[in-house]
Curated annotation (Swiss-Prot):
Gene: psbN
InterPro entries, per the entry: PSII_PsbN
Protein name (database record): Protein PsbN
Keyword annotations: Membrane, Plastid, Transmembrane, Transmembrane helix
Pfam families, per the entry: PsbN (PF02468)
Length: 43
């Protein structure tokens, strides 16, 4: 394969991996440990 194709595939995979990890952190198991500043200030 050409170098440009390999770089494109690598960067695409990196972007998909980062997006998946961000979604997992926001909505998966680790989200239980995140603090909610709006919950702390119940006006």
């Amino acid at each position: 394969m050409e170098t440009a194709t390999l770089i494109t595939i690598f960067l695409s995979g990196l972007l998909v991996s980062f997006t998946g990890y961000a979604l997992y952190t926001a909505f998966g198991q680790p989200s239980q440990q995140l603090r909610d500043p709006f919950e702390e200030h119940g006006d």
